[in-house]
Design a protein with these regions (language model features):
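C-terminal alpha-helical cap of glycosyltransferases
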Residues: 214-234
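Active-site-proximal region of nucleotide-activated glycan assembly enzymes
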Residues: 1-29
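Donor nucleotide-activated moiety binding/catalytic core segment of transferases
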Residues: 92-134
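Short beta-alpha junction loops
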Residues: 1-3, 82-87, 149-153
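Short, well-ordered alpha-helix to beta-strand connector turns
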Residues: 1-4, 75, 121-122, 172
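Short, aromatic/basic amphipathic alpha-helical patches
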Residues: 9-12, 91-101, 162-164
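Conserved catalytic-core segment of nucleotide-activated headgroup transferases in glycan assembly
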Residues: 20-97, 176, 180-183, 194, ...
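Catalytic binding pocket for nucleotide-activated donors in carbohydrate/polymer assembly enzymes
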Residues: 14-17, 131-210
């Protein structure tokens, strides 16, 4: 799905046309291997993973406690996993929420470098536009809840693309859109999203489009580079 956008940017920027070869996703392949080694915990309560991106568009800054209080005060286990860059760029707001929820026994903060452990515990994820959405959807085939907002594309390649980029076109299809006026109903929305067959089918379709050659990426990449070297040397 990235090839279309790359070709458009090359044309608009008058840059060299690149050789593009789809190898798969070595990052997801490695996470998938790790996933198989994790022992699933038995828990009577559902676990909600809050995993936003960072910066001015992230849900911490856009919605803050108006959203988080409703989630934290629900009858769920909550894992809050900030984006690693948030510890630098959004440290003020991370400190604020750590202090705000420090006495909440159902809240766990995850600053682990690897995300797979929190992903494996979650029954559903609440995010914004973070790439972890696709890690979760493709590896666990579970839905995501995303508060409704318009992403500011300034400073990104997406602003130069005529059509909607695949990421922003796909996220609404594999997630439940949460209106700001409906934050107080988050518990019911979580239950409805977890059991939503349409979302699950859309996740499977998106996975077919974006996560090709599952488990084969490293081998395919090595073979491609080897073939390129042979071509160059000849």
């Amino acid at each position: 799905h990235q090839i279309r956008d790359i070709r458009e940017l090359e044309n608009k920027r008058n840059t060299i046309i690149k050789d593009l070869y789809v190898v798969g996703n070595p990052y997801l392949d490695e996470l998938s291997k790790m996933k198989e080694t994790i022992i699933k915990e038995n828990n009577n309560k559902k676990t909600i993973l809050i995993a936003p991106s960072w910066g001015m568009n992230c849900l911490f800054r856009r919605f803050g406690e108006k959203l988080l209080d409703n989630i934290v005060n629900s009858d769920y286990n909550i894992i809050i996993r900030p984006h690693p860059q948030s510890l630098i760029s959004d440290k003020d707001i991370i400190d604020k929420f750590q202090n705000r929820y420090k006495y909440k026994n159902n809240v766990e903060w995850d600053f682990n470098r690897v995300n797979i452990y929190s992903l494996s515990k979650a029954d559903i994820m609440i995010s914004d536009f973070s790439g972890v959405i696709f890690d979760y959807a493709f590896l666990f085939e579970k839905p995501v809840i995303i508060p409704s907002f318009t992403f500011d594309k300034r400073g990104t390649d997406a602003i130069e693309i005529d059509e909607e980029v695949w990421t922003f076109e796909t996220i609404p299809k594999i997630s439940f859109k949460l209106d700001e006026n409906n934050f107080s109903n988050i518990s019911q929305i979580i239950e409805d999203s977890i059991n939503n067959e349409t979302l699950k089918n859309n996740i499977l379709k998106a996975k077919e489009e974006a996560y090709m050659y599952e488990g084969q990426a490293s081998k395919r990449a090595a073979q491609f580079l080897n073939d390129m070297l042979i071509t160059i040397n000849n």
